[in-house]
Amino acid sequence: LGLNIKVIDGEKEAYFGGVAASNLLHDDTFVTVDIGGGSTEFCFVKNGKIEKSISLNIGTVRIKELYFNKNNIDGAKKYILDNLEKIFKLDVEIPKKVVGIGGSIRALSKLIMAKNQYPLDILHGYTYEVKNEIFLLNRISKAKNCEDLKSFGIKKDRFDTIKEGSFIFKTILEELKTQTVVTSGVGVREGVYLTDLLRNSNHKFPHNFNVSVKSLLDRFQIDEKQSAYFGNNAKKIFDSLKPFHKLDNKYKELLVVASKLNSIGSVLNFYKSNDNAFDFILNGLNYDFLHTSRVIVAYTIKFSKKSLPSQEDILKHKDLLPSLEVVQWMSFMISLNIAINQDFSRPKVEYVLENKTLKINLPNKSFLIESNIDKIETPQ
């Protein structure tokens, strides 16, 4: 076939995992942990830059054959701790956040999501606190037989090494004093690709570039100039109304994203376009987005051009959303943005705040725009 096959060592494997996580997750300071059959890879990332990579001879199959099959749990723990000593000799600050890569850690995250009845069926970016879930990891590692594993909801294809994987992960989390785990749906494969793609930019996307937003715009935006206008106007509206809504600037970024992507639903199907966009956004903003952020963007689009959402409207995802007041302000601002450019003329608008009233100065009087603005429900 003419394939050029390269064999990489464990340190390089760890590096590739770090490249994938640093580009495709929202976090910028963490250590990746990739538990395999024969080894576990660690990559330390600080402020978005990879500092150190290391591979240790700790793997599920190795631990199973050397210790678990002989019921030597104490020996397994000592073996893992002895190997982890190499990490403390790296002269690197150990983060409180672990990014989990690989099948064992993803399988454990799925169990935790199911146990907690998590409202999104999305693994990449799923985050949990170690103190809340360490007990479950401990119970899985002590399972007596397949029936015990089955009772946890573990799938049959994971029976062989899930106990060992859970034991290794639990021991690592405790020894590194980890507080938070972020689940990664990407790993070595994506890291190899990104390392080649970004070879001239230190293996990092530009600071203001989001691969998910770019992908959705490339596939579904109706007009590039319209998308850019909606994004720029969103910033102006947010800043003009800041004395009223008093929202953190992180919501401005999300309002810009929602405004740029608001036409996706119409491209998919004109009827119920907002509902179509809602489902699509939840699953489409895969990379470099917190779960909370993608839910906010989805709800902002869903309630554009509509009456303000009620508490009942956001009930399903309330644990991932800010207060109802914040959601209503986001809904209002995107609705105002869309109304101002209802005829796609991209008017040059001036916003003036006087006596607690927002004045919108348009270059030309438009009955269509004015009537649509009048229909928008305002937050209290």
Annotate the PLM regions:
Residues 38-44:
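Acidic, divalent-metal-coordinating active-site segment for phosphoryl/phosphodiester hydrolysis
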Residues 13, 41, 377:
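Acidic-residue sensor for enzyme active/binding pockets
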